[in-house]
UniProtKB/Swiss-Prot annotation:
Glycosylation sites noted in the Swiss-Prot or TrEMBL record: 60, 107, 163, 176, 206
Species this protein is from: Dictyostelium discoideum
Domain FZ: 27-166
Keyword tags: Disulfide bond, Glycoprotein, Membrane, Receptor, Signal, Transmembrane, Transmembrane helix
Gene: fslH
Family named by the database record: Belongs to the G-protein coupled receptor Fz/Smo family.
Gene Ontology cellular-component terms listed: membrane
Name this polypeptide is given: Frizzled and smoothened-like protein H
Keyword Glycoprotein in annotation: yes
Extracellular side: 22-246, 299-318, 381-400, 486-520
Length: 621
């Protein structure tokens, strides 16, 4: 019974010791030093907030290293909660007392050598500071934790004890913890100014939600993220991406203008194919114009009107470019789908056309494109955002419903039609091979003629198919890029805490937020602006285009015609043969002319077929 009673007494005593924070600590062998001051950072830290600046305890770090850690801790508090409830003299005293504890020196007749000990800050005040600054215990804790991003000094609950017998002292020397809030301010009770660590920009506000609508992205009530986000990519990388966007937009604009002028104005007779192609080119032209609008206004200035603000629906150039690229992209993808359907129908039924007037296609494409763009325009959706190189739809729901759903439908239809086209090509080629191998002489001629027409028509569809495939893969990338970015949004958002910790520790420009890679952003700009150049290479560099220009008034007038004849004559004289050519050379020349004549006849047949394809399917708009 007595044994149980003593055990109970021992347990209660142990519990009381734990509650009051009794703990034996080893003598670390530190030293007392005078506080060196806050340094030349221009920001006040501990001057006036220490109980005894003439004697602070220094152990395993220099004061400069400790001061750096303290700055990181204060930066963290300011980033997390820059309000007066957190950033105030009381919390500064607590932080300074924790990092630079007062030092006491123990001497005595029995003490072998002087002993230096710290006066720790009480645990309750440490916790109070973290609570008022809303610091989560996953970042820093007053109860210790070796795996936390911010390591805080030890804070006892009430007191600590030391065993000083090896120094000639007592075995239970007690040192009470201190209450830093009782430290005299020494005339330093003025309000503390909150700063922002680079590259964040200071812009105090009482309405972060309202200012977000104006284009300011706050990390707290005092600091905004800079624009463009140098925490995601260095400024030089952003400039390169902007330059890609500007250059490709300008070249694409010039290319599509030439195509519109060639097939819309110089072309003596517009056929059904030309009309559809012109509307498709017009869509690509609009996409190029949106890029040139941004370039003319300054890409960075358009996306970032000021270094601390992103463009929103009150910035006219941003809204105009966003609306135009949205409308034009939808308009182009719709005509792309129509063109692909025509190619499939023409290959399936060799040279036949879908009997729908172009005017009805135009009415449908305009209606759909306007319906999906006027709604976002009316709700103020066109604006720039974090990690963007252009102005587009802000909310994911609008992105999905007014752009990516119709784009996805068109791409799905395009995928199906392309598979069907490939199947028809396979059938034609296989049929041609089979008929040439197994047909009788009488039927073989008819079959061969039919297969020849199919193959010839198929050859005429090479460029339209190349056009369709290039457009398919560029828009497929745009579709997948934004889908992937949206799916990784939480991952990017989670990187904000490590980024803030890095900034708090003074990482500056070396700190990185997760986001789309520079390569993916650059390729996004490339895909969005390159298509006008693709169109020019495919459509302009053809025999038909050369014929249109040769027969146009631009090259057939009193001023230009003599110049062309002179150039032709100069080249003819330069490369003409010598009069004293040998018989062998003459023979070779005759053979060459004969071959040229044959090729000319072959070309004539090809031109006839091409002419039949383009000019026999006239259709009133």
């Amino acid at each position: 019974m007595n044994l149980k009673f003593y055990n109970l007494i021992f347990f209660i005593s142990f519990l009381i010791c734990c509650i009051h924070g009794q703990r034996y600590l080893p003598v670390e062998g530190g030293k007392c030093e005078k506080y060196i001051g806050d340094g030349d950072s221009g920001k006040r830290i501990c001057n006036g907030y220490l109980a005894n600046p003439d004697s602070v305890y220094v152990h395993n770090k220099t004061q400069q290293e400790t001061l750096k850690d303290l700055r990181s801790l204060i930066n963290l508090l300011e980033l997390n909660n820059p309000s007066k409830e957190c950033i105030n003299p009381s919390n500064y005293k607590i932080m300074c007392a924790m990092m630079f504890p007062e030092c006491i020196e123990i001497n005595g007749t029995n003490i072998v050598k002087p002993i230096t000990l710290p006066i720790y800050t009480c645990n309750s005040f440490c916790k109070e500071a973290l609570v008022t600054c809303s610091v989560p215990n996953t970042i820093a804790s007053c109860d210790g934790g070796t795996n936390l991003p911010i390591q805080l000094p030890y804070t006892p609950i009430e007191w600590v004890k030391y065993n000083l017998t090896i120094y000639g002292g007592v075995d239970d020397y007690r040192v009470n913890c201190t209450d830093p809030t009782l430290i005299s301010d020494s005339g330093s009770s003025s309000e503390i100014e909150v700063g922002c660590v680079e590259p964040l920009i200071k812009r105090p506000t009482n309405d972060t939600k309202g200012d977000l609508e104006k284009g300011y992205f706050y990390v707290n009530s005092q600091c905004v993220i800079n624009c463009p986000v140098t925490g995601m990519h260095p400024k030089s990388v952003w400039n390169q991406i902007f330059k890609i966007n500007d250059v490709l937009s300008s070249i694409s604009l010039a290319c599509t203008l030439i195509l519109l002028f060639t097939f819309g104005i110089l072309n003596p007779k517009l056929n059904r194919f030309d009309k559809k192609n012109l509307f498709f080119i017009a869509g690509v032209f609009g996409m190029s114009v949106s890029g040139v609008l941004i370039a003319a206004n300054g890409s960075e200035k358009t996306v970032c009107p000021t270094p601390e603000r992103y463009a929103v629906n009150t910035d006219r150039v941003c809204v105009a470019s966003g609306f135009l690229v949205h409308f034009s992209a939808l308009f182009a993808i719709l005509w792309w789908t129509i063109g692909l359907a025509d190619v499939y129908y023409g290959i399936k039924f060799v040279g036949k056309k879908i009997k729908i007037k172009v005017r009805y296609y135009l009415l449908a494409t305009l209606t759909i494109s306007l319906a999906f763009t006027l709604v976002p325009l009316g709700t103020g959706q066109y604006q720039a955002g974090l990690s963007n190189v252009m102005c587009f739809l802000k909310d994911e729901i609008y992105q999905s419903m007014t752009f990516f759903v119709p784009l996805g439908i068109c791409l799905t239809m395009g995928t199906i039609l392309m598979i069907l086209v490939m199947r028809e090509i396979y059938v034609i080629v296989k049929s041609n091979s089979t008929s040439s191998s197994f047909s009788s002489s009488s039927s073989k001629s008819k079959s061969k003629s039919k297969s020849s027409d199919s193959i010839s028509y198929l050859k005429l569809q090479v460029k339209p198919m190349l056009n369709i495939i290039l457009f398919y893969f560029t828009f497929l990338y745009l579709f997948l890029f934004v889908r992937v970015i949206n799916s990784r949004y939480q991952e990017y958002e989670d990187s904000a805490i490590p980024y803030m910790l890095c900034l708090a520790k003074g990482g500056g420009d070396s700190c990185r937020l997760k986001g789309p890679s520079a390569g993916s952003l650059g390729y996004f700009a490339y895909c969005l602006r390159i298509y006008g150049i693709y169109l020019f290479i495919i459509s302009f560099l053809s025999s038909r285009t050369i014929k249109i220009w040769k027969e146009s008034i631009i090259l057939n007038n009193a001023f230009v015609t003599p110049i062309i004849k002179f150039i032709d004559s100069s080249f003819s004289n330069r490369f003409s043969s010598s009069k004293n050519t040998s018989t062998t050379q003459n023979s070779t020349l005759n053979n060459t002319e004969s071959d040229t004549s044959k090729r000319g006849n072959s070309s004539a047949v090809s031109i006839n077929l091409e002419s039949r394809n383009y000019n026999t399917d006239d259709d009133d708009l």
